[in-house]
Design a protein with these regions (language model features):
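Transmembrane alpha-helices and adjacent helix-loop boundaries
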Residues: 1-223
C-alpha cells in the first residue's frame, strides 16, 4: 500500500506541471480567443435579432437555433473531421476556436439581446429628444447600461466556456484533458490524472469566479 501511495504521489507531482503548462498554453488562450471572437459575433447577432430588417432578424434566429439545438461536440466534429471532405482542412486549434466562437456567439447573443431589451423605452425616447441618432443612442445611452446588466451572465458564460474547452481533446487539441489522456496511457492511473485535471480546472474557475464577484461589486457601485 505504501509503495502504491508513493507511486501515485510521484505521478501526481510529475504530471502537475505538464498539465498546468497545457492549461496556460492551450486551454486559457483557447478560452480567451473564443470568448473574444464570440462576443463580437454575439453583439452583431443581437443587433440583427433586434433589427427591423426581417432578413437579418430571421438569419440571426436561424443561426441561434442551429447552434443551440445541436451538441457542441458534434459541431467540433463537423468543423474538424467533416469539412476536409469538401476540401476545407483546418488546424485542430483553429477548428476549436471556430467551434467555440460560434457557440459563444449564439448563447451570448441572447444575453446581450435581453440586456438591451431590458433598458426602458423612455431612455430611447429621451436620447432622441436630445437630437441623437439611433446609433448614437445605442452607443452612448443604451449600451453602457446594458453592459452592467450583461456582465454577470457573460462572466458565467466565460467560466462555462473554460470548462467546455476540455471537449477540444476530442479533435486532438493538446489542452489539459488531452495531455492527461496521454499521461494516463503511460501510467495506467486514469482516476488520479482525471481528478488532477478537475482540480486544475477548479483552480482556474475559482479565480475567475472571484474576479467576477469583484467586477459585479465594482459595477454595482456605479449603478
Amino acid at each position: 500500500m505504501d509503495d502504491k501511495m508513493v507511486r501515485l504521489a510521484d505521478i501526481f507531482v510529475q504530471s502537475f506541471f505538464p498539465l498546468l503548462k497545457a492549461g496556460l498554453i492551450f486551454t486559457i488562450p483557447l478560452t480567451v480567443l473564443s470568448f473574444t471572437f464570440g462576443l463580437a459575433v454575439a453583439f452583431l447577432t443581437a443587433l440583427a435579432r433586434l433589427s427591423n430588417i426581417r432578413l437579418l432578424s430571421t438569419a440571426a434566429k436561424f443561426y441561434v437555433w442551429i447552434i443551440r439545438g445541436t451538441p457542441l461536440l458534434v459541431q467540433l466534429f463537423i468543423i474538424f473531421f467533416g469539412l476536409p471532405s469538401i476540401g476545407i482542412t483546418l488546424d485542430a486549434f483553429i477548428s476549436a476556436v471556430i467551434g467555440f466562437t460560434l457557440s459563444v456567439g449564439a448563447y451570448s447573443s441572447e444575453i446581450i439581446r435581453s440586456a438591451i431589451s431590458s433598458i426602458s423605452r423612455g431612455q430611447w425616447e429621451a436620447s432622441q429628444a436630445l437630437g441623437m441618432s439611433k446609433a448614437q443612442s445605442m452607443l452612448r445611452i443604451i449600451l453602457p447600461q446594458a453592459v452592467r446588466v450583461a456582465i454577470p451572465p457573460l462572466a458565467n458564460s466565460f467560466i462555462s466556456l473554460l470548462k467546455d474547452t476540455s471537449l477540444a481533446a476530442a479533435i486532438t487539441v493538446s489542452e489539459m484533458f488531452q495531455i492527461s489522456q496521454q499521461i494516463t496511457a503511460r501510467t495506467y492511473e486514469p482516476l488520479l490524472l482525471y481528478v488532477e485535471v478537475a482540480l486544475i480546472y477548479l483552480i482556474f474557475s475559482s479565480i475567475l469566479s472571484m474576479t467576477q464577484s469583484r467586477m459585479e461589486i465594482k459595477f454595482a457601485r456605479h449603478v
